[in-house]
Amino acid sequence: MALLCPSLPSPNSRLFRCRSSNISSKYHGASKELMIARSGVSTRSISSEKGLSRRDLVLIGLSSPLSMFLPLSSPVTHAEEDVKMSGEELKMGTMVDDINAYSYAYPLDYPSEKLVFKWVESRKPERYSSAAPLSPDARLRIVSERVDLTDNLVISISIGPPNSRLTSKEKKTWSAKEVADSVLSDKSALRVTSSQRLEESSVLDAHASDIDGEPYWYYEYLVRKSPTKIAEASKLYRHYISSTAERDGYLYTINASTLGKQWDKMGPVLERAVGSFRLLPPTDSYVPPYKDPWRFW
């Protein structure tokens, strides 16, 4: 289940404007229809959890977890549903990973933009211990990933313990900016210091939301790329949007990204995917990341 918002207008600065959606759902037997009512919300830079940002509603999905509506008979479940947005149907697929106990929705078909997404599972869901590391110390690991090479889209899930930037043991005291810095400082395959890795990224917005009594931290950022003679200026960075939640001492993060020049078109769709991310109640298939974390088979 995902939250939708209309296309973003052209940016007039490094921050981008977005519209949030107020959602009411109606269920008739086995069929479901999500009715979307739009209301305008604009971004600002880093927002504090002490004062709610107007952007706080942009990425919030429905409070009920997807597991209420989806069968969990296998470690990975895929489902489809149609979501109406401004009279157009956006078909969403739903991915449920029982191994790591999370779910999210991803776009399949967007008629108003004449888009048919061509997703490939570049990394099928796997336990934390056998997942590919995103940093030299192997703390942060990518447990699943899907890509659309045609539209240059990537949606991935990573898991890793908090680093020293999160000094408090009480997660409800963490700010979204602190969580973003913790994740981004670990997110690199380069052998550089954490401060250098942070310099590669520019956080545009960060805020937190409480969903079912648990904090979810949302942040939007750019990752700069090294310029080359053949690269156009608009391709020198990727635009990311992420959501992080904590369970059992580990941070679970969904990352969705595209090229910076495509953000106006693809950003609203990726925001729906990130807004739908939820940690699910563990099933018998769940393998906690602290179980044999260095077992690679």
From Swiss-Prot:
GO terms for cellular component: chloroplast; chloroplast thylakoid lumen; chloroplast thylakoid membrane; extrinsic component of membrane; photosystem II oxygen evolving complex; plasma membrane; thylakoid; thylakoid lumen. Disruption phenotype: Smaller plants and frequent morphological defects, including increased lateral root branching, aerial rosettes and multiple rosettes. No effect on photosystem II and linear photosynthetic electron transfer. Pfam families: PsbP (PF01789). It is found in: Plastid, Chloroplast thylakoid lumen. Keywords: Chloroplast, Plastid, Thylakoid, Transit peptide. Gene3D superfamilies: Mog1/PsbP, alpha/beta/alpha sandwich. One of its GO terms (molecular function) is calcium ion binding. One of its GO terms (biological process) is photosynthesis. Involved in strigolactone biosynthesis. This is PsbP domain-containing protein 5, chloroplastic. It comes from Arabidopsis thaliana.
